[in-house]
Every structure is written in structure tokens, then in C-alpha cells.
């Protein structure tokens, strides 16, 4: 974390948990060697600025808390690498990536980082008969006559590359947006998600 304060351009900054002296380019904190074994894909500050979340290529989610002596909480997930992360409240982050599905994580006041839920409810697959035309098309495209449905059960059909706030802000996000390599942009409403996913609450 570096200081981006520019003298005579920005207002004189107040002291923060990250430090009090902030000349431009000053290294405020460094978390290399915090246990992550892959390059960092995305970072996000909380609304207060006291917490910093990042996701790395080894499928790890990390949250550093400057107000608690730079304490770092980490969670090694079982998912494919995550490519984007964003705070949606002071204690909750949404991350997404190669699994094509946004996921909610919670970091409580003690620094315990936990996985809460996937936010994309899988669609029911439909069994159907295929026509002779589709059978020949499958032979040509996939070298098979079987109707192997390659459509994913998630809304996004390829990796999600960006998670961003759509409504309100990082203090109390109501809706967020995901965009992916499939060219799709999806708006997610937390009120709708909380009613459809049992036990889901944004802390």
C-alpha cells in the first residue's frame, strides 16, 4: 500500500491507521509473504479505508485490517482462482472469477474470515429430444452424436472479470454488478438474494 497524497494538490491528510506521514510514494504497508502463493488479481478497500481485501491466483481471499495492527486474515478456498473482489459492507466482500459465480465472504470484528454462500442459484437442466439437424451439427462441431449440453448452470457462461458496486456504496451495498468474458453484465440485488438463499444475511 503506497501513499498517493500530492502536496499542494490534495488537502492535508489526517492521520489514519495506515500511518501519519504520507509523502507521495511512501510505502504504508506491505503484505508480501503473508501466505499467498499466487499473483494478486484484485484489491478493494472497505468504505472506512481501514480494511483491504485482495484475491490471488492460488484461490485465496485475504483481508488486512490496519486498525488492528495490520492483522491479515486468509481463507484458502476450494474454488477456481478469483479475479475480482469488492467490499459490499464493512465486514462483507463479494469475489468472483473462473467459477463464473459471485461468492460472498464475511470477515467479523475478530478477524475471522469465512465463506458464506455462492450467490448464483443453479438453473434446473431440462431434458429434451434432439432433432436430426442438431445430431448432424453435434457430429460436425463436437465429434459426437450425443446431446451434451455445454451450457453452464450459472448466469455467466465464462469467467467473471469485474465486480463493482451498482447501488448505494461500499458501506451498505444494495445491488452490485458483474461483467465477464462472455460479454454479459449482470445486476445482483441483495434483497432478492436474501429471500431466495436460506440464511443469507449481509453483515
Task: Please provide the spans of the model-predicted regions.
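Surface-exposed loop and turn segments in beta-propeller and other repeat-based domains
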Residues: 15-33, 118-152
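Blade-level signature of beta-propeller repeat domains, shared across WD40, Kelch, NHL, RCC1
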Residues: 166-169, 173-198
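Conserved loop/turn motif of beta-propeller repeat scaffolds
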Residues: 49, 90-91, 169-173
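Conserved GH/AH loop at the N-terminal boundary of individual WD40 repeats
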Residues: 34-36, 77-78, 119-122, 156, ...
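Conserved beta-strand element within WD40/beta-propeller blades
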Residues: 1, 52-56, 93-97, 176-180
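Per-blade loop-tip surfaces of WD-repeat and WD-like beta-propellers in eukaryotic adaptors/scaffolds
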Residues: 1-30, 58-73, 104-114, 142-146, ...
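Short coil/turn segments within WD40 beta-propeller repeats
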Residues: 1, 38, 58-62, 99-101, ...
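Canonical WD40 repeat/beta-propeller blade segments in eukaryotic WD-repeat proteins
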Residues: 32-45, 79-87, 157-168
